[in-house]
Amino acid sequence: MAEIESWRSKAVAQDVVYPDREHLGRVLGQLRELPGLVTDVEIDRLREQYARIADGQAFLLQCGDCAELFSYCNPKQIDAKLKLTLLMSLIVIYGARLPVVRVGRIAGQYAKPRSKPTEKVRVDGEEREVLSFRGDNVNGTGLEERTPNPDRLLSAYFHSAATLNYIRSRLASGLADLHAPRSWSFQHVRSEYLQHEFERIADSISDTLDFIRAVGAEPGGAQASNTLNTVDYFTSHEALMLEYETVLTRETPRGVYDLSAHTVWLGDRTRQLDGAHVEFFRRIRNPIGVKVGPSMKPDELVQLLDTLNPEAEKGRVTLISRYGARKITELLPAHIRAVRASRHADAVIWCCDPMHGNTVPSPGNPAVKTRLFSDIVTELAASLRIHAAEGSRLGGMHLELTGDDGVTECVGGSMELSDADLARKYQTHCDPRLNYEQSLDIAFLVSEVLRARRLGHPHSENDALVHVLARSTDPAAEGK
């Protein structure tokens, strides 16, 4: 296991400085003795499913909070995210006629990369410089909680364990029963066209499920298909905290696995070829993600793949593109061509993150971050189109969302939220997230695009859906 410590000889980007190193050592010793949060068997099952995604035989839906808080570890919020993910996956399955691999940004997504180690805040009318909030597993949001506290790593472990245990119990208890499309409400949809389209898709899904029951696959019956009642659901997070990841990495007869989550990803700030994070990632057998943004050079991307996946194992690396709606057309084709010209052409999974490149200040309050739904849809649609034009395949989408309805953090969508609505229910402590309704908008859009391509008319009815969703940021556009 000495090899898993090899990252210590490299530069650590986004490193956290703990004033009390002895305290940190004691906490890491405790964590080293605790069981892994997931198992190597579960991770290998996900590796098999990722290989099918790389072959075009499945679709990846990876979604959840930007950064979890410990307070999110409660039945209401876990249920909300879990139910939304299951609902979105059912909608995509209907259009794509492909299995959907569900991966949550949950049960460990506590750390938060920052561009600066400190930030300025106003206290009693005066501006003070304090340590930046780095996520609940590092420090707190209160000014008196900004010193990194090793005990928060233990709290992160136990909150992750409780969240994961609750998810497993809910799925085992029938939460994933897929027989509810007729109960879906589309009252939030202001566009008559979109409401009609969403209701049409829901009716079609209901008809399909009625057919399944009619041929003897009724849940609970002798011929029941287990897939109608239970599903696989995997966990993921950005592996920022290498000390934490290392003590939860274990050697088993199958190999070396990071048992903090089923899959982890490299952020745009920690993917240096000669850095500690890449060194750690290349040692573990988990499937891994790599954020690919505007600063990534095509040859650098191929070098990174050579380092992380020297055997070109199918599905081992997911490339999570995040350019921004105004840059994707310029940057994505070159990255696709570089990968297609390499030995990794058939091994990678391409996944679109239409969130991180589209964060902007609110016009009404520049201190508040938001995202325009039109930008999110534009980047996602462009990614689908560019991959098709380049002879590649978009294998999934990576979204920041909350299962809570009525949250107002992103502007637009079928609810036609305006900038003025942000103050109504803006709750994030990190980046703005899609709410329940906006998340369904995305699911319906992707489902329709994949359905049209499956039926051989990729530029027909889905164009109207993309157009209406993209312009729905501006309520005045309706009816033009």
Please name every model-derived segment.
Residues 1-59:
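N-terminal basic/disordered segments at the start of proteins
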Residues 1-8, 46-76, 294-306:
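Short N-terminal secondary-structure initiator segments
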Residues 45-47, 274-277, 334-335:
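Glycine-rich, charged/polar anion/phosphate-binding loops
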Residues 50-53, 91-93, 280-281, 386-389:
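A general structural signal for short secondary-structure junctions and capping/turn motifs
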Residues 56-59, 346-352:
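Short coil-to-beta-strand
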Residues 61-66, 103-106, 352-355, 400-402:
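Short loop/turn segments at strand-loop or loop-helix junctions that form parts
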Residues 67-68, 72-324, 368-371, 379-380, ...:
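Active-site-facing alpha/beta catalytic cores
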Residues 310, 316-320, 325-349, 356-407:
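Non-transmembrane, aqueous-exposed alpha-helical and coiled segments at domain scale
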